[in-house]
Amino acid sequence: MNHPVMNVSGAERGRCCASIHHSLDICGRSDCFWNCPSFEPQFPIPQRDLEKAFFLETSGARNVNFRQACAIESLALMNPHLTVILLMSGKDIDLESTTMKTLRKYDNIKIYVIKLGDYFIHTPLEQWYFCSTWNYGPYAVSHLSDALRFLTLYKYGGYYFDLDIIMIQPVTHYRNFIGAENENNLAAGAFHVDYLHPVIRMAVEEFRDTYRYVR
């Protein structure tokens, strides 16, 4: 069965010269012809001493649905001193939809669009993003979401929550935790790490080194 290929933003990055001193691209292929372009951060980088939490919308949707908006709103309401950040991968975000307009009313909710190619540059997952086959097959969005949640906390520290988790109490007294799926497995739907915590670097590197494409 043929599956659609998820577009890799900034795909030219995978073919540019990794160094001015040789003609290999970042994927190790020869005969590259141009230097890798520079890039600029796409949104204000959160202060590293700021309490923050991240949600990710990686399907390319223009907005979040009502259930997802409730999850974001509940976290902001229960934790007024927490900066709640929604990162979206879509290219045409509808900030005038009912859900997005509601979220934008909160001072502690920030909504940013990320350009995926730039987000992975100069990180341990750069080659994974540009050189592996993660974007083929039926699980591309899921694989991208897994990579982004680990990479985001690797870059900034803080909390990560899936968009189907509703908060009924404050969370900021929980630190450096991850939920359990069962007695043998951990779940990556809710976790926290302090900035530069060694565990998150280990998680990112293990994801990179053990990733296997699943048809």
Residue map of PLM features:
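Juxtamembrane luminal stem/stalk of type II transmembrane Golgi/ER carbohydrate-processing enzymes
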Residues: 1-55
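Extracellular/periplasmic catalytic domains that process cell-envelope and extracellular macromolecules
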Residues: 45-49, 104-105, 170-171, 182-185
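Short, charged/polar "capping" segments at the starts of alpha-helices
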Residues: 63, 91-98
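Histidine-anchored nucleotide/phosphate-binding helix
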Residues: 63-81
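Short internal beta-strands
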Residues: 83-90
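Active-site-proximal specificity loops/subdomain of glycosyltransferases
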Residues: 95-96, 100-147
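GT-A fold catalytic core of metal-dependent nucleotide-sugar glycosyltransferases
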Residues: 138-186, 190-198
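Catalytic core and acceptor-binding pocket of nucleotide-sugar-dependent glycosyltransferases
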Residues: 199-215
